[in-house]
Amino acid sequence: MDSSCIDEISSSTSESFSATTAKKLSPPPAAALRLYRMGSGGSSVVLDPENGLETESRKLPSSKYKGVVPQPNGRWGAQIYEKHQRVWLGTFNEQEEAARSYDIAACRFRGRDAVVNFKNVLEDGDLAFLEAHSKAEIVDMLRKHTYADELEQNNKRQLFLSVDANGKRNGSSTTQNDKVLKTREVLFEKAVTPSDVGKLNRLVIPKQHAEKHFPLPSPSPAVTKGVLINFEDVNGKVWRFRYSYWNSSQSYVLTKGWSRFVKEKNLRAGDVVTFERSTGLERQLYIDWKVRSGPRENPVQVVVRLFGVDIFNVTTVKPNDVVAVCGGKRSRDVDDMFALRCSKKQAIINAL
């Protein structure tokens, strides 16, 4: 091989190596260099240095209303701050609805002069209703979407108690309250079972009563997802339950909201729940409850033997024990008592 061929091969090899090295060391294209400046409301602004333009890529649209924040599922949340702590007011389908909920909470937390989204958010009597309830109660109404219903029921009740048949104010609220109670009709009663007040978080409505008093809108109950039904208790509090048909068990049930009712009223198996309806034009539904009469059943006692002593749990209520019921809640002071029984001396010693 002559020297000219060697020179040509060397030069071509050098050129290819130089081109490869230059290709590896070349900077990335300008379009790949982007700086991100994060903005409020979950939005990000992309800065493109090549053409000097700003393009905005929004993940969640921000709201124009005070106290309203977007949610990943497309809905809108409402929140308010109290002593540097965030108080969640619930999630809503429309941001206007969330804004009104914020306004209501702001009026309760900060008074009539609070900064709100809409003017004239409070009507006559609304401020008195807010002041008559605690902040926690108002927040609970907003979260459960029952504020409007409870306000409406309160206004009707106040109007009925203050005006007689001739349109004049009546100072005797007790007499009017008796009339209110007399205008109700009892639909049905049910003694709740252990599963009704257990961890299933549902109340089974007897089929004959469900189809007669609470018919579902769909011709076939199996295809409906259920409806929300509002009930008012004896204290004027509105309870909203989801009422639906379970095709698996072929039963009508109250689900969402029922566990909260069981917890607040301290319901136990055997207690009786009463469903009522007003005879007036509004056809308002009511719910009430009462403690089962008679002694409770004696449960099976679990005995543990420790150091020659039988230790067992006494869960029955003795005749001399007092069970107090006040405001729909009963005392549990006598429920949990322990007794020691010595195996040698058949004496029972109650220890608190």
Curated annotation (Swiss-Prot):
Keyword Secreted among UniProt keywords: no
An example molecular function term from Gene Ontology annotations: transcription cis-regulatory region binding
DNA-binding region per Swiss-Prot/TrEMBL record: 64-119, 188-291
Keywords: Activator, DNA-binding, Ethylene signaling pathway, Nucleus, Transcription, Transcription regulation
GO cellular component, as recorded: nucleus
InterPro entries: AP2/ERF_dom (IPR001471), AP2/ERF_dom_sf (IPR036955), B3_DNA-bd (IPR003340), DNA-bd_dom_sf (IPR016177), DNA-bd_pseudobarrel_sf (IPR015300), LEC2-like (IPR044800)
GO biological process: cellular response to hypoxia; ethylene-activated signaling pathway; negative regulation of DNA-templated transcription
Record region (Disordered): 1-26, 46-68
Transmembrane feature ranges: none
Skewed-composition ranges (Low complexity): 1-25
Domain of life: Eukaryota
Cellular compartment(s): Nucleus
Keyword Cell membrane: no
Function: Probably acts as a transcriptional activator. Binds to the GCC-box pathogenesis-related promoter element. May be involved in the regulation of gene expression by stress factors and by components of stress signal transduction pathways. Transcriptional repressor of flowering time on long day plants. Acts directly on FT expression by binding 5'-CAACA-3' and 5'-CACCTG-3 sequences. Functionally redundant with TEM1.
Family statement drawn from the similarity comment of this UniProt entry: Belongs to the AP2/ERF transcription factor family. RAV subfamily.
The protein, known as: AP2/ERF and B3 domain-containing transcription repressor RAV2
